[in-house]
Each structure stands twice: as structure tokens, then as C-alpha cells.
Amino acid sequence: MALETEAKNSNATATGDATATKASSKAKENNNTAGGKKNLNPIPSQQNSNQNLVNGNGTAADGPAGKKKGKKNRNKSPPEPTTEAVLSNGHAEKSTAEYAAEDNADADANANVEKPEDGGAPDAEADGEDIDLDALQDVGITVNISSPGADVLCVQLSSMELVQEIHQLLMDREETCHRTCFSLQLDNATLDNFAELKAISNLEQGSTIKVVEEPYTMREARIHVRHVRDLLKNLDPADAYNGIDCTSLTYLNTITQGDLLDKKKTRPDSVDCTPPEYVTPGVSEPPLLPLHPNVKNAKGPQALKVLTTSAWNPPPGPRKLHGDLMYLYVVTMEEKRFHISACSKGFYINQSTDDTFNPKPDNPSHLSHSLIDLLSHISPSFRRAFQTIQKRRTMRHAFERVATPYQVYQWASPTLEHTVDAIRAEDAFSSKLGYEEHIPGQTRDWNEELQTTRELPRKTLPERLLRERAIFKVHGDFVTAATRGAMAVIDGNVLAINPGEDPKMQMFIWNNIFFSLGFDVRDHYKELGGDAAAFVAPRYDLHGVRVYNAVDVEGLYTLGTVVIDYRGYRVTAQSIIPGILEREQEQSVVYGSIDFGKTVLSHPKYLELLRQAGKHLKILPHAVLNERDEPVELCSSVECKGIIGNDGRHYILDLLRTFPPDVNFLKLQDVQLSKELVDMGFPIEHRHKLCCLRQELLEAFIEDRHVSFIRIAAVHLQQLNAKKQSEKTEGKPVPALEGADAASKVNGADKTDVKEEKNEENEEKAQSTTGESKTAEAMVNAIREAQSNVATSNEVQAAEVVKRACAAVGSLKEKEFDFRFNPDVFSPGIRHVDGEEGTCSSLAKQKVLVQEAAEFLVLKQIPAFIKEHMTHSSPPIDGQSLTESLHSHGINVRYLGKVIKILGQMPRMDYLHRIAVLELIVRATKHIYYTYMQNTEPLHLSAAISHFLNCLLTNGPVNPAVSSEEAHKKRGNGGKHNKHKSSKGGKGQQQQQTTGNQNGSSSGTSNGSSVSDWTLVTPRSLWQQIRKEAKVYWDWELDCDSIETAVSKYGILRISLLRAFCLKVGIQVLLREYNFESKHKPTFGDDDVVNVFPVVKHISPRATDAYNFYTTGQAKIQQGMFKEGYELISGALNLLNNVFGALHQENGSCLRMLARLSYLLGDAQDALAIQQRAVIMSERVNGMDHPSTILEYTHLSLYSFANGHVGMSLKLLYRARYLMVLICGEDHPEVALIDSNISLILHALGEYELSLRFIEHALKLNLKYFGDKAMPVALSYHLMARTQSCMGDFRSALNNEKETYSFYKSQLGENHEKTRDSAECLRLLTQQAVLLQRKMNDIYSSGKLTSDLPPIHITPPSMGSVLDMLNTINGILFVKISRKDIVKVRSEIEKHFKADSPENEVNDAINSIVAAANNNGEAEDADPKDVKEQAQAGTQLTNGEKAAATEATSS
């Protein structure tokens, strides 16, 4: 069940269906309430102590969660919509076992479902979990730490922590940070670094741990010097811009000018609220410089001129015997030069000079254990600067100092000063990964580490946490190593293992990682599309590795895999199977085929393991004929190879065909697509034959069929029931047991009454399909009723019902709901063993099923995707969020052309159309750019890239800096660096060649000069290639031949295109303002291309228990149990901290949810503290201009305002608006929301004219995207009326308020509170307008102003009323609603569903109850602190989500 429940939740979160989670978390929730609730509460306290350790201080980062623990039960507040969840791992990872329980062929299906993933569903170990959680909460040890020369430090630690983490804590604190070589002693016994604190017998509350300085070794001395260097350049953002050491940027502190929590409330009249020019409505191209504010002052003071290893290294023999370890050379700010010796006791100045070696100590000698102490002693300016750096470092938020899990690259960078740095130089040329790699054995055995961590025990919660933490740590290190290695390979810094072969056939091993290039080396992919197939194969292989890792079958192993795109080349990095290099592949493979099915092998152990995995992945076991015409059984695609390593482990590799092929992009002889698809232009012949369907699609398809199956069965059962009723009157009873047996057969189970389980499963499924959930639920009730009535039916009739339903939905089995796919069904050259017609093994049936799944994608999923975005509830902001949304619906990006065609006919989806067109242009350009880069010498990289950017983004002169003759001259003797230059190129090569035919299958043996010579590319030729690529790859006519026409026709911003393209291909440009309209000189010069960085694809490991806690917490929130929800989500955050450390995308999702809950529970200060951490985390982990970061900024601005930081709230909104416009332009529904917020706050500050500009823009956008009959439009009219009335323009105000009133009256009725408020507003405005008119008339008649006329008094709104309005705009509406009302709503809904009432009747019923609850003030049984969030359907939340009316509406 674990995976299954997770899958449901993941489904709900991915599709943004706020209602789905409740039902699908049922199992978990019941377990938690029954057995585990008492244990869940203490979890936040452990999170506290954890964060103490992670963050190095117990204040900024851990306050909120800690405070919550003691909070009285403030009784529940509003449900947070589920879309927040996306706690999936960022790869749209739905779990693999979604339907395993209900439609497995084997009787023991359920046992198998649970086996592979003991990973953490509470029901998997209901008995053991109590002990686990008790163990988890054994926390809160307070110890004193005594360091030499520093005050005793008192810290609270978690018993789960390792001693090593106290080391880390001390190295992070200001007073002890300069120590690295020390041990920790308790009662004179040295503590083991890798021991858990709870394992230390004599450690108790109040114990004192002593820090004891240890003698240095060569390694420790090097570590110390590196640490000193890191401390000195801690404030320097250069590493973050260069993409080194997992450093990244955050600008929240710069924007808020310090910690928000330390700020005093601001008086409205003291706020500077003028928006910068670039955030006011109407900006055409936003500037680039504000993206990185305060760049000039980012770097701290300089403490030393030079700190480097000395040229006198290493110490000669005699000096080694005196204990010398290494020599350093230092130039201080006072221009003094020193040579320093490191010995086992510490550091001292020696008497060497640049010319003479004299290692004796200087006179007077000063030996310091810490290099910082020695430098402070010899240089006063060092001492001052170091103190300043330390102060600034410790003032920064803890999250600003921790390394990110993976490197985040910046696409724009200022000019960086290049300083002398010996350690950086050493890192660049050493083959190791830096000092942390100096472990026994020197190079790491990545494969052994990756597989051993997966083999760790996982029975109990602490074991699973340890296992997941180890997997995550090793995976992170592997990704870092693989990325470095791939760059070294392309830069020509690694020797090939087959140096004699053609450069593009070369393979490499570096640091125990195997690297191969994305070319078709031995015509392996010749039949499948050559280089184009070879280029995409690693990506499909990575998808396969991901899903097999998610299933996690014990005994089945995959390789560590990372795919890196760098400088136009695709490099695959894999861990090495032990023994694989010692034998030929033919001897190694014991399962699968190495020649696409000509020879096929099978192996009983592999069949057993893959059969288990296949149940989750919906892979159908099938038989194929080998070269001797013998049938061979397979449980995977033919290409999937099984190799037993020298370590005895069963490895699978080449998983590129894990999922069935996409017949819409294959031209096949024996496939006839439906008329609708043919009319839409399918099949489109793709340039490779590896296209396959996504896992999300298969899950949605099976879910859809299951709903149909239940419906059809229900109809037949009702007919049977009617027949039985008539028979009953004749009095022919049948034994009840027989009927129950028959009914249970619906689920394909034997003699077990599974109908309840089946109905629950169906409820879960039905709820996660938004459009059909209500009818499906009605059907479930019908089938329940029918089954109970049919208890008297006989087995034969029930079996007949199931048989008919199976036939109707196209099940593989006649008498059972069974949907699995044969991935080889259309593979060329494979001979299948055809089974009997109508059985699972019938090839015709398998083909039809794959065809139907592909048809389902086009006819159901694409319309569902568009329908979901019609509400603009969580609109994509850039190409990445659009791609994620498409993937969550199971739609591949190759369907983007079809999606654009549909969006182009819908004016209300204009913004999405523009984002999609931009993404398509960027992807088409990427294909061309990769080939272009492969044909460029390293000497000309910056000139070639700037030339390409000029051709893409400008119409001005694009004279390349290198003449074409010179380029040819260089090309003749191109050096090693570019030896991978392909004669065929990578993906996207075919469209470059003038000879290439329409379907991209040109021979590609010779490059035309237009391709081989980058200097000949012009804006016109590049855009022609982009148009051609759009047509060939996406079957879409791009109607523009230059950037100008793209801008005018599609509304694309050049700066947005520059950002998207740089991020997609890994270019870093100089941070400056670019004049794209320049007619006299090229926009981009050589110096504007600062760097190229790798684009890395890998599988991020998951934290299963945290995920379960999170989804259970969401279920609680949806039921209105906010306190319990808060505690569960705090628990999830605590577990995430345990697995991932302090910084991770998923931690950010938890923080955002906790902040929202705190706000709804009435604790705005708590919300502010937590949300501040969420913003910093998103900036650092996702990127400064990532869509999530914009979302976090808008949330933070609301909580800032609620805390009285009015000016700060505006600054945060200005930042969010700037980033929005930079990414996608002003024409976007989310900009309307931000503008409404800005307008309201400006209005509160009395800046009416500015306020009016923003609200007018918001109204224009709301009218465009929501139509005139929508809540956001009514609110915009009302806000506009408020602002105009304050300006004295009562006539306009009156007209606008009338619009609001007419909307409320027609949509909500005359007696609704909002309608009455609007009517009152109209009355006051009319009164003021009449009064003003009377005054004007008096003035006109008398010709002069009279002094006795009373002035018109305009009251500015109170801050409280502004906050209420902000909550309304952002979809947070606080309503008092009692438990009695909830019961009423629930019974009302059930009644309507039974009667099969239309949806709008149900909504009316809910609205009337909620309205009644509101009008009665506090209803019976109402707790004054009972707060419910009710967001009208269509009202937008800040984060662009839709909230359900109440818990009841989600049932």
C-alpha cells in the first residue's frame, strides 16, 4: 500500500486537485490517529534541535516550530490547497504501484505490493512504529562545550546527531570557527566522530564536552589552510557566480536590509513607497541590472593580499624529520611578506625569503595552533578585517551559509575580480575532488557506495532515515563528481580508455566513473535514428533508472547515472559494474539482448526480480523468439540488459524502453490511427524511433479505464438487481455467500470479500480525476447498493457482468480488470510469440492497448491540461513550469506544437500560448546551438557564442570577431579539445543540413559550409533553421522569420528569451544592460559571454516517511484539523532535515505550508519568521528568478504587512513583480494579483495616483483572463472605486462600484454580506457625489468660493481593513463556522450526490449554509477561535492555487 497511497497523493498534488488528498491518505491517517497520534506531537521539538545543529544558532532558523509546540489548540483553520505539496522530487515522480493492489493477476498481488517498499507508510509497520517514534523523540540533550580561549558554550543537541556534527557546529560559530584540528573529549575519553550521541553512555544533561587541540598531520594542515581561505572569502559571491562548491546567491537580506524579524513596525507616513520605474505598469523591456542588486558592496573587506602555498614545498628530508609539514607564503595588507611553516604543533614565521630557504623560526618566535591567531598577531589590518568579516558572516541568516545539495548556476554575472588563489589553482588541476576525498583508497568506489547504501536495513523509522540520508549524501557526491568529470572530458583533460579510436567513439574513466558521449558509435542506433537516437537514449535511460529506483525491489540494482550537457555535447556518467571491464559485453549479459533482439537471453533470477518491479510499472511479461526460434520469456523490454557483477549483484542497464512506444510519432505499417488523430496530422515521423509514453500518462489512462469499468459494471449490476427484485417476488432465494463471492470477483480476487477495498480504491481514483469525480462517486454508491442487493445473485451472472465490463474497457484479461503494457510491441526486428486471441498474450490486444493509450494522450489529456489552466489557479510562469505541468499530465514536450495550436484559438489563454511559443523557440534553438558548438574551436568559443546570441536576439550588425579565413585556417589543425567534433552532430543535426529531408533522416555524412563555419550564420539563416526545426520536430508552423516578427506577433520579450536560452544550454552572460535595438554595433561582444556551465540531469532521491507525514498532514488540514496538520508537517520538515539537511526544495514546500498555517492560526509573526526562511531557501536551491521564488516573495509580503512592515511589504512585491516581468512579461494573470496587492498597499499609504495605475492594470488583465463575470474582476472594480473616491473622483468611483454590485447581486444574491456591503458603499458614494455636485453648483452660481461650505472629508482606510482586503484578494477569507455547520454541509452534499444532483445545486446548498453561518454571527457550538478558510471557486490564492470551500466539500 505504501507506494500506492503515495502515488495517489502524488497524483493529487501534481494535478492541483485540492480534493484528492483527503481520501487517498485515508489509510495513513487512520493509522496515525489510532496508534501513533501521541507520538507525533513531540516531533517539532526534535526538529528544533536538529536545526540548532544545522544552522549553528538556535534563534533565526528554529523559532517558529519550537514555539508552536507549546501553542494552545487554537482550533483548526483553513485548508491549504494541495498543490503546495509538490513534495515529489522535482521530476514529476509519481509512484510506481498505483494500481498494483486492484488489478494484479496473481492472487498474492497485495503481498508483493508491500514487499518492495517497506519505505514508510504507517500501515506498513503499525506495530513497530510506536517504538520508532519514541526513539525519534528521545531528544533534547543540553551540553556545555568548553573551548580553549573561549567562553563555555551551552547547546541543545538531538540524540540522533553524530559527534561529527558538533565539530561542524563549532567550525561555524564566530568564536570557534578558526579551529579545525581538535578532538572532543568527555571525562578525558575522546569521542568517536561517527558515534550517535545517544550511543555515548556517560553523556547526560549538563555534561561538559572539552575541545582539545590535536597535533596536525599533513592532511589536517591542508584542511586548516583551506578552511582559513574559506573564512576569508566567505562574503565574496565569486564562487556562487562561478558555480563552485554548491554555493548560491540570495538577495532577500539586501532587499529587506537586514532580518525582517528585527525590524520595528513602520508608520505609514514614514514609508518611502515610490516604485522603481521598471516595476510600474507599462514597462516594455525590464532592465537586467536589478536582477542582482547591490553587487558592488557584496564583497567583504580584504584581509590579506596573498595567502598561498610556498614554492619551497614540500619540506626536504631533514626538515620533515624536524616535523615540518608544509610552507605557506603570505603578503599582508601592510605589504609585508612572510614565509610560514606548518608543523605538528601549529604555525610559525620562518626566516625564508623568496630567494633563500631558511626554515628556522623567526625572532622572536610565535607559535600558534591556529593560522588565524598567527596572522592576527603579525598584521593589525588582518585582525580588523577578519573581525568585520566574521561579524557580517554571523549576521547573515543560517540558510545563507549552508551549502546547497546540488549546484545552482547563474545565467548572468557581474565582472569578477580574479585574485591569486593557490587552493583554487590546486583544485583545478588535481584529479581528486578536493580535500574531503582524501579517504582510505583515495578514489571512491562509487558503485560500491551507491549499492551498499541501498542495501542498508529499512525496517524501522530510524533505519529508514539513516538509509535515505546515506543514499542522498552519496548521490549528491556522485552528481558533483560526475559533473566535474564530464567537464574535464569535454575540455580534453582526461585520457580516453580507447585513445586509438575515432574521437567520438572514445570512452573515458575518471575517478571510478565511466563517461560516454552522445553519438551513435558503432551504428548501434542506425535503425532507430542514428545520432539523434543516441542523443536522447541517455535521457530515456535516466527515466528508466528513476522508476526502477522508486520501486526499490530488493536484490535488483541500477547504475548511478547522470546526464550532463556541456558545450554542445551530451555526456553520460555511470558507475562501473565490478568486473565489467575485464570481459566482453557478450560474456557479461545473462538477460536481455545486446543487438536489439537478434539474440535474446533470459535468466530465472532476473525474471523473478523484474516480475516484481513490472507489477508496479505495468510491464507485461511477454515471450519473444531468439535466433534459434525458441521462445524466451522477458519481463522488461528486449534492450534491458541483465549483468551479474563480480560482487554477485544483479544489475540492469539500458532501461531506455521501460515504457511502451508512442505510436503517434512512429510511422508503422500495421497501425491505423483513429480518424481524429489522422485529422490532427498524426502520425508524425520523429527523427528517432525511441519515443515512448510517460509513466504519468499510463497511470492516468488506467485510472480512466478503471472509472469506466466501475460505471459499466454498476449499470449491469443495477439491471441484474432489477431482474432479481422481480424474481424475489416469485420467492426464489439464493444463498447469500454465493452472491458475495460472485461480487468479489469484480476485483479479480478469489473467495475474499474485497468489495469494500475496491470501492475505497475507486473513491480514491475517482476523486483524483477532477472532471468526473462527482459522477464517479455517485456510481460508487450505486455499485455498493447494487452489490448488496445482488447478494442473492449467482456466481455465473456476476462473472458475466465483470466479463462484459472488461470487454468494454479493453482489459487484457477476459474476467479481470488487467492493464499492462508490452514495451516491445512495436519494436522493429523483434519476433513475438503470439498468444490466443482474447488472452493477455494476444499480440493484437497488446498493440491496441498501446495505441489507445497514445490516443488517450491526445484526445483526453491535452484537453484536460488546457481545461485545468482555464481557471488560472496555478498558471505556469516560464517554460520550466509549463514543462512540469505537461509532464504531470503525462504529455511529452514533443506534443508542444499541438498544444500551441489549441491555445492559439483561445484568447483567454494568451499568456500560456506565449510561454509555450517561447519554450518551443528556445528548444528548437537549442538543437541548432548544440551542433553549432560542436563545430567551434575552443579558441573561438566566446566569439562564436556572442555571434549566435546576436543572430538570435538582434537584427543589427552581427560581424563575427573572427574572419572566416582565419576560422578555416584554425579548423584545419584543430587540437585535442575539439576532437569530439561530430561528422553527424548530435540531435538537431539533420535539420541543419540543406540536404536533410523532411523527416530528419538524411545521411548526414558531410557538413555543409553553413554548418561547419559558425561565422557564416546570420540572423536570417538562424531564424529559417528555427522555423524548419519547429515544423520538423513539433509539426508547428512558426510564423516569424526574425526576432522582430517574433516580438510583434507573439509578444515575446527579448530579455525573457535570453534568460530562457541561457538557462537551457548553460551560458552565463555579463550582467549589464543590453541594447537589443542597436543598429550600429553588435549587442553582444566577446566579453559579454562570461562562462559556459553544464546542464545536469539526475534523479533526486526521496524521503518516503517525510512524504507520508506531509500528505497525512495535508489530509488533516483538509478536515480542518489545523493543529494536528501543523504538527504532522513540522514532523515532515524534521524528517526532511534528517535526510536532506537544512536546504532542499522539499524543505521549502514544508516551510511555505507551515507559514501559511501559522498565518491562518492567527500567528502572523510566526508566519513571517518561517516564510523568511522559505524565501531564502527557494532563492538558494531553486534560483533567484525561479517561479517558486516569486511565489515565496508574494507570500512574505502579505505576512510582512500583517506584522506592520508596510514599506517592506511593498519592496517584496516590487521584487516579485520585477522577476515576473523579467521571466514572462506583464501580460499574465499572476501579475494582476501582484498589482492588486501593490495597489491596495499604496492606497493605504495615501499614494492614490500610483495605486490607481496598478489597479487599472490589474483590472485590464483580470477582464482579459477571467471575463467580466468573475470574482477577481469584481474585486478590482471595488478597489478602483475605493481609490477614485479617495481622489475625489466620485462619478468614476460610482460607475466602478456599480459593476461590483451587479456582479455580487447576480452571483451571490441580494442577501449576501458582500452584496449588502457593496450596496452600502454605493449609497455613501452617491451621497458624496451629490454633496460635491451641490458644492460645485454653489460655486458656479455665486462665482466664488464660500468659506462656510463644509469640506468633504475623505477617511483613509485603516490598516486592519486593508489587511482584510489583502486576505480577500489572496483568497484567504476567514469565516466563523461551527462543527454543526460542517456536519450540515457534509449531509447536504451526500444527499445531493445520492440524488445525482448537478454540481451547481451542490454549490448553492453549500453557499447557503455558509452564508447562514456567517449571518448568524457565531453559530451554536462555535468556538470563537474556530477559523475556516473559504475561498470561493475562482478566487485566487497568493500562490495561485484554489482552495476548497470547507473540508466537507472535499469529501
Swiss-Prot record:
Domain Clu positions: 424-666
Biased composition (Basic residues): 66-75, 969-984
Keywords: Cytoplasm, Phosphoprotein
Chain intervals with Basic and acidic residues compositional bias: 748-758
Provenance organism: Drosophila yakuba (Fruit fly)
GO biological process: asymmetric neuroblast division; intracellular distribution of mitochondria; mitochondrion organization; ribosome localization
Low complexity: bias regions: 9-53, 989-1010
Residues the record lists as Phosphoserine modifications: 270
Role this protein plays: mRNA-binding protein involved in proper cytoplasmic distribution of mitochondria.
Keyword check for Phosphoprotein: yes
Region: Disordered, residue numbers: 1-101, 264-286, 722-775, 961-1012, 1413-1451
Protein name in UniProt: Protein clueless
Main location: cytoplasm
Family, similarity comment: Belongs to the CLU family.
Cellular compartments annotated: Cytoplasm
Any Gene Ontology CC annotation: cytosol
GO function terms (MF aspect): mRNA binding; ribosome binding
InterPro entries: CLU-central, CLU_dom, CLU_N, CLU_prot, GSKIP_dom, GSKIP_dom_sf, TPR-like_helical_dom_sf
Keyword Phosphoprotein: yes
